Amino acid sequence: MEISQISDIIFKLYLYADATKMIHYTTDGNHAHKMCDKIRNTIVDFADELAEQTFGYYGKPSYTQLTKLNKLEINETDDLGELCARASEIVDILRTEFNKIDKLSGVVSLIDDYKGAMQKNMFLCSFDKVSNYKQK
């Protein structure tokens, strides 16, 4: 897998994290505010650890190898549960590719832990009508 493909996904995760702040600023509910912050922290912490571990294996990228931020797009949504689902699904391709490389088993475990945390967040979003999203 190319560094540029990996960096695309990592930086899209940061965009999803920022999108949670957009939801945070537009909601009145205390539960929704707390969930937005929790989800944002989950995504940011994961993206950082994913980058550190992945680039530890592939080698430190040059600045020019990284994705140009103005070229990135995500499917925006104002539904926090749906945002969790999208931010979780985006790493599926990494898991599939990294699962083929024995030395990246730690990254596969990291991805699995993240996906589990996001599933929990989606469930917690169902309380107090923070999200109407129904998982597939």
Language-model segment annotations:
Residues 15-38, 97-105:
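Helix-loop segments that flank and shape redox-cofactor active sites
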Residues 6, 17-24, 47, 51-54, ...:
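A structural signal for well-ordered alpha-helices, especially hydrophobic packing surfaces
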Residues 56-60, 124-136:
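Long amphipathic alpha-helical segments
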Residues 1-6, 109, 134-136:
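Charge-dense, intrinsically disordered terminal/linker segments
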Residues 31-64:
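Conserved alpha-helical segments that form or flank metal/cofactor-binding pockets of metalloenzymes
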Residues 7-10, 14, 37, 44, ...:
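Short amphipathic alpha-helical segments with heptad-repeat character
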Residues 1-10, 16, 76-83, 87:
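Disorder-to-helix initiation segments
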Residues 69-122:
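Acidic/histidine-rich alpha-helical segments that form the ligand environment
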